[in-house]
Amino acid sequence: MRRKLIHLALVMLALFQMSTIAATPVQIEHQGLLLNANWQESAEPGRGPLFLIVHGTWAHGGMEIIAGLQDSLAVNGYESLAINLSLGISDRQGFMSCDKVIKANHADAAAEINRWVEFAKTLSDHIVLVGHSRGGNQVMLYQQQFQASEVERLVLIAPMTWNPAESAADYEAQVGRPLAEVMAQAHGDPNAIITAGVVYCPAAEVLASSFISYYDTEPNRNTPELLATVARPVLVFEGTEDPLASGFKSQVALFEKNQQVTVQWIDGADHFFRDLYTDELVDGILEWLQR
């Protein structure tokens, strides 16, 4: 009984510390766009590396999994910066909408991540770059194009996988139009605005070059392929209850010989690692950092 009371007291203390450390909005400029992020201090500033966190598809830095990661890292004494990719919109907040012309480009994330890395370098010489879902793939695209020595490690949480045949079949099933037909239209004039289903939007006005970035073979959106040649330490998390994880599991052979890559499965977790699974993520990350 006494042990349980002590444990409860420690948990309550941690929650109190967490509640007194509010995330601070940060804004910088990049190529004429205002970029937003949430800066989370910790109870013990300077304890370890700074975590720079990238959200998933058309999401934002305040979504549940990202905010949970920041809170858990803060309780453990680590500072973090959760960014909002602009998706082509200056001062973007919240989830992406289908109501306006979509100019988001999958590949543009790499340069925006680099802009935030440059900012983060003014705060810390040791950076861990974290990406969830599509953000995990975009973190890998970043590391292919930019080589900041301060970015020492990468963490990918349920990173995106991609198969061209499956993508085409899924697109036609969801939208009712062959993907090849829309791609031909988009390639005909990449600067045109076309009407098409794209990502989560069943029908939207979208810049043709943006559409291409989400459905063409380049940039490479199949993260297991990118892991084959990564030259810095990478930790990949997958949840056993994530229906999307099968695409990753089936391609482990592509990178299993690369000793830089560590894969950790979390039993019971789905794609978003909610509640206590978020703490398991952070525990796994911190244990990995000590190796």
Go through each PLM region and give its residues.
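Catalytic histidine-centered segment of alpha/beta-hydrolase-like enzymes
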Residues: 269-278
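Short, surface-exposed "cap/lid" segments of acyl-processing enzymes
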Residues: 44-76, 80-85
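Conserved alpha/beta-hydrolase "acid-adjacent" motif
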Residues: 243-249, 274
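N-terminal cap/lid segment of alpha/beta-hydrolase-fold proteins
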Residues: 21-44
